[in-house]
Every structure is written in structure tokens, then in C-alpha cells.
């Protein structure tokens, strides 16, 4: 969408609650430079220990990161494995391994696309073209592209060197620091289904090679490993004593093992379940202090450490320290005090061996499940994040600077999901955490009300999804819907509930067993199944409600819940049992709905959004063969232009301008990130984008897209088209709280620019005359046709966007440079009063116009009488200021003449010349005195600060100007006095200049004309 290149979304954060970090590596010779990979955030680099960051991977087609490895012999070479190795229900899959040769400026994919998830990369330090990749594979799929892969030619070709079966991947891969051919791998058999996870099986185990993977030995009971099935294992060599190796082993009985012969034989040293392996499927990594073979770090829900070789562990980072759920760990190989760790909420940095930690608040890695908006001015966005609760923050602010982390307010704990503002009182929101824990929260007071629907009877078990469906009734502000296996409705904001449906799921007992985990149970509600995920009441018919379930049912009632129709197996192209992630009821047609489904959890990556226009009699997959990438996650149809449709997929944002006939990816600095939810703030026509990995983005004012969609995406036939303007507010901006000054380390999301946001399209190809005009002239008029302001703005092909600060034509300040021919008109005049103004844009011989509505700050409206009185006084004062400017121009011209005269006199001789030279110096002195009376003394030649407190014409004029513009109230007698004083001072200065030019300057000119120097011209 090149024609919209000047229309870019703003990333507003937050970063105070970041997201899952899966990979960390640093340059050993300069550890201030390190790299962080987010589960779905891309690769980020800091060159100053975390003070500032830059994104390195945003131009790539995928941002889901599993591993990072820097080639220490040449740190410009970096390898990145995509697809995270933490196979929870919300994992993000990958598409191969990437390599950069220039420190991340450019990247090349080096294969292994079908492995889906690469959890670890090793580089042979003696031969960096030899690289190993641990492919953990797709936990939802059964496929052979798993195990350990090796390249000996820098990634040009790969060989799979370790494989056990189609559900086993490599979960850990470690290299002996003293022998790069000696590697230990953990092969892990595991499989995830939407309702179940199983860890362990015959494909699991520890394998060791001493010849770079040509031959492997599986370590068994005879080697000290546990008998029976094994699961996920963490492995770590002690760099200071490489014969010492540790393994954290998931088995029938989990244990911590130690080898003292380099990994060939093992002994159990700890099997205390309170200390070992709480959630091995999600985190099972261990690390050894590089200088102390007995000090071990175990990263899991918390971080614990051992000082006695694993016999006992104590807490280093508690559950409420930094953030729980730790996935990545890096220790400097020669400075054991420097540690960087990654968790579900970002990264922590320690420089004292873990005694204290600094949380980095600049990485906007938030994984949002949902997004919503209220109707405040400025409006707020709100939503819930994976493992980071639910939050509300401003889409833009009337505060100086950017959108800071502490502008965001925590609403609800746990894993956060949908947040819905009360339409009658935006201080109240509905918010929830996992498993249907829904409540109402007052943002102003913190008052909380839990409103989860009760079971219909005491012993009836309710099933709530990890991410339960909720929706407001568009016809009744007091009514809300909520989903379990039933559809619940409350007509009193959740105080009481009624069930208005039967069980709308498949209600399959085999999918409700709560036995998930395999060798180690992990029953957290993440695998709750046969539940309602999506609820969509029609805004056109109060009796119509659509429901989508996680087990593939699409249900419809047309009578308020009395009867239901299930479309399971009746939607051509939709797999029976596919996950229904979203349903959208049309704002245009009560019979129309969109169903967003995906089936990647069963290995099918088809991209599907189905539409019906006849209550489900017929269906169409509107994404079929349209070139989109990544399975579909969400969609929204514009509420005023039906041709405009947005779709979010696992790999970015896509836009249709022709009612889903075609789609294009929206880039314009927006990355190919997992785009999880979309909504439109209707009053301001903003698209709000919730990403699962890069927090929240706002695409301001989508009216240009509406205009293009109105033409079905066809090319503009005229050279110039002005777009309808959004309402603009003359807002007062307050000072930012918290910090007066700050260094690096303070995150600021991008704020909306000040001023009226205005847009126009240019199609240079439509001008057959080929007349060149690279800038447009913009003029603003009041309702009486008076021109108020003129601007010149750049006119690129495609969309152009600029901002008007509500100012009228201004005047030059006394002594300021005269404008160059063709320069932009002087701005800074008295701002316009709230109202409607006409804007005409002219490009060559083409013109188009629109109306611009300017509104007052709703917090502090200004009465028209006050505005008029202040403007009248300002205009009166400006008359004097203009007189002074014109007068000062005379002495500026005289100074320029003196400079030229001094140049001509330099080196000249003669009595007349000497006399003229003396008079020239006198003229300089005279002008200096005049200048000082108007502007004050200039800085001394001596060193130091010189701020003279001179009372001058300029200070008197400035005091009057400040009195008018700096006061809220209408002008007073005090204002009148200051203006009169300014007028008097200006008159005195103008008279003094006129006396000088008609007297001493005229005499000087006469003297100069009598000499051979011919400078003056009539």
C-alpha cells in the first residue's frame, strides 16, 4: 500500500508490563551490547546496557523468536531461530532460521522452515561455519522436521543428525566448553491439543555425542538416568570444570542429577518436589556460574539457586520479584556478576550476581488478547495481556511528551483478557482473568465487584475458557452477555444472571478430563475446553446473537435465545472442530456476520474468515486465495464504509478496500507481528490494533482509507482529492507528571501530534499536462470568506498528511529576517475561535476543499466574548508591533550598508576616506544605541553569562503581549495600561529611528556620496 506510506500507526506501548522474552545473547568483549528476542516481538538490540533499544527484525516476515546466538569471533554474525520453545496454549510458531552478517541491518533466511520452532542454536567456536539448531518442532503437529540439525557451511545446507520420532523435538542442546564436538541433547516427546498437553514418552531422553553428532548414545538407567519414560530436561556444563554436568530431569519422579565425568554417568542429588521442576513443559532450564561449579541457577516460576551442587536450592527471585515465569538466562563467561534474565514480563539485569535487579521498562513486548475503547476525550484504550493482567491507557494525551508507562492503569490481575467499558459510565469497566473470573472495576476509586455467573445448580460444573467471551447488548446499556458452555445474560450489569441457551458446545467428556500435563500435571485452566469464546449480538436486531466455541460450533439465535441453530459442518471450507476465535455481527445487515476461525492447533494453517449475508444459509471464505500470510486471528469492518475491512493474522495486518475482493498487507513501519484484535474508535475514526507481542498501536484517522474504499480501491482519477477532516480540539497541554528531566530509560509511546490532522491524495499520473508541482498551497477561510492562513506543504504521490496549529497569519517580530521570495507565510497569529473553517488545497491548476471543525478544549471552554475581547486587544497591539518591525527594518538596512561600506573602505587611503571611515564608526555606535534601547544590551565580549535586566521597548511590548495571551480572563484596565505603555514605547522608538534616518543617516549618506565610494543608489 505504497500510496499510504505517509500514514503510519503509532506504537503507544505500554512497556511497563512487557511480554515473554525467550532468548538473550550478548557480545562477550562488550557486554553493553546485547540482544533480546521476544516470543512474538522480534529481535531487539541495546548498545548501552539497556539504556536505549532498537528493533532489528521488523522488516522480516515473522517476529516469533525462539533463540539468538552471536558468533563471538565476529559479533556481526548473529543467528536467530524463529518459533518459541515454550509450548503453552498461546505459543507462537516460527518459520526457520535466520542469519545476519552485518549486526542485524540485513537478514537472510537460511532454511529449516518446516521445523516451526527452534529453541537453541550452538556455534562451534573453532569453526563458526559449523552451527547446530535444536528444533523442538510444532507441539500441535505430528511431523518429522524435528530434532538436531547441523550445518558445516554457514547454513547453506543442513543435515538432521538426531531424531527419535514425529512428536519428539530437541528441547535442550548444550556444548562442552572444552570440546565443541561433545554435545548433550534432550529429546522431548510432547504433544499439545487444544484441551490437553502430554509430556513424556519413548522419544524422550538425554543423548550424548563426542564426534559432532555423527554418533549418539542415549543415556539410560545403567548410566544413572531414571528408568521409565522421561520428559523435558534442562542441562548445563560447568565452564570452570567441564567434567561436571547437571541435568534437571522430568520423569515419573522428577529429579536433579549430576555427572562428574562429563555427562557419561549420573547420580541423583535432589528429588524434593518443592525444589525441582514445577512446570517443566514451560521452563526447564538450568545454568552454572562460570567460575563456581557448585553454584547453579534454576529458572522456572521463580529463580532459585544452589551453592552445593544441586543438593539444596534457595530463592533468588521470588514470585513477586521482577515477574514470574522465567525463560531466558545469560551470564557473562568471565564476569559472573553480570546476569540478564528474561521472563513473561520482560527482562531483568543484575550486576551483583543476582542480589539486586533492574527491570527494563522500555521493551513494548505486551501480548494483548483483546482491545477496546471508551468515548472519553481523549479516549482510552484497554485490554488484557498474556500473564500481565488487564490495563487501560490513553490513545493520545494532552500532556507534553509521549505516552509514558505510568499513564497506564492496572485494572485486573492474572492473565488479562477482554476489557469492556460501561457505556453509561466510563469509570467502570468489565474485566476478567483466566477461567471466567469476571468483574467490574471502578478506575477512579478501585472499587471492585465480582460478577461471574453462578452455576444453574450447586453441583453443575461450569466450563469457562481461558479467554472467555463477553459482549455488551447494543440495545441496552445495562445488559451484558458472558460465555461458559452456556450463554449467560445479565440485565443489571452483572448483579444477576440468567442462562439463555442450552450447552452450545459439543460437550465432549473426553475433552474435559483435566488430566493435562503428562508426566507432570499442569492443570491451570489453560486447557479448559468445550467453551464459548466469541459472542456477537447484532446491532441491527436485538433478538439476534451469534456465538462461537473453541470446539468449532457456530451458533445463532434469532429470538433472543429461545431457539438456536448450529452451523457445525455446514460452513463450506471450515474444518469441523476448528477454533472459533471471533464472530462479528454486521453493522449494516442483520443477516450478515463474519466468523474468524483457525485450525493450526490441529496442524492446518489455512487462512479463514467466513461471511454469511443470509443468516447462515450460504457462506464464503473471504480470505481464500487472497495472498494473506499467517492464520486469521481477528477482523473488523469499518462502521461507515462497508468496503473497508481489516484482518489481523499471525503475520501482520491486512486491508481490503473493495469489500474483501482483494487484500494488501499494511506495513508503513508496522511489523509482521501477531495481530490479535482490532477495534475502531468511531468518533475519531481511529483503528486500534492489539498485537500479541508488540503492545498497542493506533492508526489515526482512517478516513483516507474510507475514501479509497468508497471507490472500491480504484486508482484516483483526479490529480488532487482532499479528505474529510476529523474534528480537531484546541487543547491545553499540561506538563508531564513524575519527571522534570530524564535520561535514557524512560519509555514514551508515540503521542498524537498537536494540531488539526489534515489529509489529501495526489495522483500525479492523472495530470496529463505533466505539470510539475511538488508542493501544495493550503488556505484556510472563515465563514465570511476571509483568508486566515496559508501554508505550503509537500505533495507526494499518494496520501499526504499535515497539521494546522489553528493559527492565523502572523507578523514578523521586530528585527527578524525578511522572508525570502516563495517562503511559507508567517504563522503564529492569534488562534482561530472554535468553529468550522474551509480549507482549500491547490496543486498547480487543481483545487479541492473540505471543512475543518475546530472545537474548544472540553475541559476549559472559552466564552466567545472573552475570545473576541482578547483578539481585539491583540490586534491593536500588533499594529504597534508592525510599526516597530518596519522601523527596525530601516536600521537593519543601514547596518547592511555599513558592512558593505566597511568592506570597500578596507585598504583605501586618502583624507576623504579617513573622514568617511570615522563617520562609519559613528554610525555603528548610533545604531547600537538605538538597538539597545529597543532590544537591550548585547552580550559582553568577556566570558560568562550576561542577562541584563534592561527595560526596553521589546520588554514593554512583550509584557503587554503576555498580559493578553497569558491570561484566561478578558482584558482588564491593567491590560489597557500595559498596551498603552507599549504603544507609547513603540512610538518613541519609531520616532527615534525616523529622526536618525532623516538626520544623521542622511548626512552620512551625503558625505559618502561626495567621496569616490559609490555605494548608495537611488
Predicted stretch roles:
Residues 1-746, 753-756, 763-765:
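Beta-propeller blade termini and top-face loops
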Residues 439-441, 758-759, 766-789, 836-840:
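Beta-strand-rich binding/interaction modules
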Residues 483, 796-802, 828-836, 846:
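A glycine-anchored, Pro-Gly-centered beta-turn/N-cap motif
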Residues 704-734, 851-883:
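Low-complexity, Pro/Ser/Thr- and charge-rich linker/hinge segments at domain boundaries
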Residues 810-814, 842-850:
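Short acidic/polar inter-strand loop motif in beta-rich domains
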Residues 852, 886-1018:
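Mature extracytoplasmic or organellar-lumen-exposed domains after removal of signal/transit peptides
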Amino acid at each position: 500500500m505504497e500510496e499510504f506510506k505517509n500514514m503510519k500507526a503509532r506504537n503507544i506501548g505500554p512497556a511497563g508490563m512487557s511480554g515473554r522474552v525467550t532468548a538473550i545473547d550478548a557480545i562477550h568483549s562488550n557486554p553493553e551490547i546485547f540482544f533480546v528476542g521476544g516470543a512474538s516481538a522480534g529481535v531487539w538490540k541495546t548498545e548501552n546496557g539497556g539504556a536505549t533499544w532498537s528493533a532489528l527484525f521488523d522488516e522480516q516476515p515473522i517476529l516469533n523468536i525462539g533463540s539468538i546466538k552471536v558468533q563471538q569471533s565476529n559479533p556481526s554474525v548473529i543467528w536467530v531461530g524463529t518459533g518459541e520453545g515454550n509450548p503453552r496454549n498461546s505459543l507462537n510458531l516460527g518459520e526457520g532460521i535466520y542469519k545476519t552478517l552485518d549486526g542485524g541491518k540485513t537478514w537472510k533466511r537460511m532454511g529449516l522452515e518446516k521445523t516451526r520452532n527452534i529453541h537453541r542454536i550452538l556455534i562451534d567456536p573453532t569453526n563458526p561455519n559449523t552451527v547446530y539448531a535444536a528444533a523442538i518442532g510444532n507441539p500441535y503437529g505430528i511431523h518429522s522436521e524435528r530434532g538436531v540439525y547441523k550445518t558445516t557451511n554457514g547454513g547453506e545446507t543442513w543435515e538432521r543428525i538426531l531424531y527419535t520420532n514425529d512428536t519428539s523435538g530437541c528441547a535442550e542442546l548444550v556444548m562442552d566448553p572444552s570440546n565443541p564436538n561433545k554435545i548433550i541433547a534432550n529429546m522431548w516427546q510432547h504433544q499439545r491439543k487444544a484441551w490437553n498437553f502430554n509430556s513424556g514418552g519413548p522419544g524422550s531422553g538425554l543423548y550424548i555425542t563426542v564426534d559432532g553428532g555423527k554418533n549418539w548414545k542415549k543415556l539410560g538407567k545403567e548410566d544413572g538416568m531414571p528408568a521409565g519414560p522421561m520428559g523435558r530436561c534442562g542441562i548445563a556444563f560447568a565452564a570452570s570444570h567441564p567434567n561436571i554436568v547437571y541435568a534437571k530431569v522430568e520423569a515419573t519422579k522428577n529429579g536433579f542429577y549430576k555427572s562428574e565425568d562429563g555427562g557419561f554417568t549420573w547420580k541423583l542429588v535432589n528429588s524434593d518436589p518443592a525444589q525441582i521442576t514445577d512446570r517443566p513443559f514451560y521452563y526447564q532450564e538450568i545454568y552454572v556460574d562460570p567460575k563456581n561449579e557448585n553454584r547453579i541457577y534454576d529458572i522456572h516460576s521463580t529463580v532459585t539457586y544452589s551453592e552445593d551442587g544441586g543438593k539444596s536450592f534457595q530463592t533468588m527471585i521470588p514470585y513477586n520479584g521482577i515477574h514470574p515465569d522465567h525463560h531466558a538466562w545469560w551470564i557473562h563467561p568471565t564476569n559472573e556478576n553480570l546476569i540478564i534474565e528474561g521472563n513473561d514480563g520482560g527482562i531483568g539485569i543484575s550486576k551483583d550476581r543476582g542480589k539486586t535487579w533492574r527491570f527494563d521498562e522500555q521493551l513494548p513486548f505486551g501480548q494483548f488478547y483483546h482491545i477496546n475503547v471508551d468515548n472519553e476525550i481523549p479516549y482510552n484504550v484497554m485490554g488484557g495481556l498474556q500473564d500481565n493482567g488487564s490495563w487501560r491507557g490513553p490513545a493520545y494525551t494532552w500532556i507534553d511528551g509521549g505516552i509514558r508507562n505510568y499513564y497506564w492503569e492496572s485494572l485486573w490481575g492474572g492473565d488479562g483478557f477482554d476489557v469492556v467499558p460501561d457505556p453509561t459510565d466510563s469509570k467502570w469497566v468489565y474485566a476478567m482473568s483466566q477461567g471466567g473470573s469476571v468483574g467490574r472495576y471502578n478506575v477512579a476509586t478501585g472499587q471492585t465487584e465480582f460478577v461471574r455467573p453462578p452455576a444453574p445448580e450447586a453441583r453443575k460444573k461450569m466450563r469457562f475458557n481461558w479467554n472467555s467471551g463477553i459482549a455488551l447488548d447494543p440495545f441496552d446499556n445495562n445488559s451484558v452477555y458472558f460465555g461458559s458452555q452456556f450463554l449467560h445474560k445479565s440485565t443489571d450489569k452483572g448483579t444477576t444472571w440468567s442462562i439463555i441457551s442450552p450447552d452450545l458446545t459439543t460437550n465432549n467428556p473426553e475433552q474435559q478430563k483435566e488430566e493435562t500435563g503428562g508426566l507432570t500435571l499442569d492443570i491451570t485452566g489453560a486447557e479448559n475446553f468445550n467453551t464459548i469464546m466469541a459472542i456477537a449480538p447484532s446491532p441491527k436486531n436485538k433478538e439476534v446473537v451469534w456465538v462461537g466455541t473453541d470446539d468449532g460450533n457456530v451458533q445463532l439465535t434469532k429470538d433472543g435465545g429461545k431457539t438456536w441453530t448450529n452451523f457445525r459442518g455446514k460452513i463450506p471450507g471450515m474444518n469441523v472442530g476448528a477454533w472459533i476465535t471471533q464472530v462479528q455481527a454486521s453493522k449494516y445487515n442483520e443477516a450478515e456476520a463474519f466468523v474468524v476461525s483457525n485450525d493450526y492447533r490441529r496442524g492446518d494453517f489455512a487462512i479463514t474468515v467466513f461471511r454469511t449475508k443470509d443468516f447462515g444459509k450460504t457462506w464464503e471464505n473471504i480470505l481464500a486465495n487472497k495472498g494473506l500470510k499467517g492464520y486469521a486471528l481477528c477482523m473488523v469492518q469499518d462502521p461507515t464504509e462497508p468496503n473497508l475491512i481489516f484482518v489481523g493474522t499471525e503475520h501482520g495486518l491486512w486491508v481490503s478496500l473493495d469489500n474483501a475482493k482483494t487484500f494488501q498487507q499494511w506495513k508503513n513501519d508496522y511489523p509482521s507481528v501477531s495481530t490479535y484484535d482490532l477495534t475502531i474508535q468511531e468518533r475519531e475514526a481511529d483503528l486500534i490494533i492489539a498485537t500479541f507481542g508488540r503492545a498497542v498501536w493506533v492508526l489515526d484517522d482512517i478516513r483516507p482509507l474510507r475514501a479509497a474504499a468508497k471507490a472500491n480501491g480504484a486508482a484516483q482519477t483526479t490529480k488532487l482529492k482532499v479528505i474529510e477532516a476529523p474534528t480537531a480540539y484546541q487543547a491545553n497541554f499540561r506538563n508531564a507528571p513524575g519527571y522534570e528531566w530524564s535520561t535514557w530509560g524512560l519509555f514514551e509511546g508515540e503521542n498524537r501530534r498537536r494540531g488539526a490532522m489534515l489529509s489529501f491524495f495526489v495522483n500525479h499520473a492523472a495530470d496529463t499536462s505533466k505539470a510539475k508541482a511538488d508542493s501544495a498551497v493550503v488556505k484556510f477561510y472563515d465563514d465570511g470568506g476571509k483568508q486566515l492562513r496559508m501554508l505550503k506543504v509537500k505533495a507526494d504521490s499518494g496520501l499526504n498528511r499535515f497539521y494546522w496549529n489553528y493559527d492565523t497569519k502572523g507578523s514578523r517580530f521586530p528585527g527578524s529576517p525578511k522572508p525570502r521570495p516563495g517562503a511559507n507565510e508567517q504563522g503564529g497569529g492569534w488562534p482561530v475561535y472554535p468553529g468550522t473553517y474551509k480549507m482549500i488545497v491547490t496543486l498547480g491548476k487543481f483545487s479541492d476543499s473540505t471543512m475543518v471543525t475546530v472545537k474548544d478544549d472540553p475541559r476549559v471552554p472559552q466564552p466567545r466574548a472573552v475570545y473576541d475581547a482578547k483578539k481585539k486587544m491583540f490586534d491593536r497591539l500588533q499594529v504597534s508591533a508592525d510599526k516597530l518591525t518596519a522601523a527596525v527594518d530601516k536600521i537593519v538596512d543601514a547596518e547592511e550598508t555599513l558592512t558593505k561600506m566597511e568592506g570597500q573602505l578596507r585598504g583605501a587611503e586618502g583624507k576623504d576616506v579617513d573622514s568617511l571611515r570615522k563617520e562609519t564608526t559613528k554610525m555603528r555606535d548610533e545604531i547600537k544605541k538605538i538597538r539597545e534601547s529597543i532590544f537591550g544590551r548585547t552580550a559582553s565580549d568577556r566570558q560568562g553569562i550576561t542577562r541584563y535586566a534592561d527595560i526596553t521597548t521589546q520588554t514593554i511590548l512583550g509584557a503587554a503581549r503576555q498580559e493578553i495571551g497569558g491570561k484566561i480572563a478578558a482584558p482588564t484596565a491593567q491590560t489597557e495600561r500595559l498596551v498603552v505603555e507599549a504603544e507609547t514605547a513603540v512610538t518613541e522608538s519609531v520616532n527615534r529611528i525616523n529622526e536618525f534616518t532623516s538626520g544623521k543617516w542622511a548626512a552620512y549618506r551625503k558625505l559618502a556620496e561626495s567621496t569616490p565610494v559609490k555605494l548608495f543608489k537611488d
